[in-house]
Amino acid sequence: MDSKEVALDSRMATRKSDLHLFSKYVSVYYQTGLLEMLRENGCDTLFICGFSTSASVRAVAMESPQYGVRPVVPAEAVGDRDDYVHRSNLSDIEKKFADVVPVQAVVDYLKGRGGNGRKKGREDGNLG
């Protein structure tokens, strides 16, 4: 995107192989090819980051289990225009649809994976 408001944080280390999806719809599953890509690559977990917690983040967290995908929301990597709306939706998402975890838990989990996307060491799939 061309706007700084929706640009990726410059502190993020990215690779050419990283997939960044931007959708004009509430669900990133709609017309992006995400589900097909996840299935083709044997991915069963999706880390959901972005804006807004009450709309897009919630929609994807709700839809993911229906497709056999485990939704994980790094708590500090999502937001909304209103803090109360953000916090209440994040709490509801955690109670009903997804694992809501600290960003550091995701970082630690991803550090334990090999360059080919396969797990090294732990096989239980837990983040923390």
Predicted features and spans:
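Active-site-adjacent betaalpha module
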Residues: M1-G128
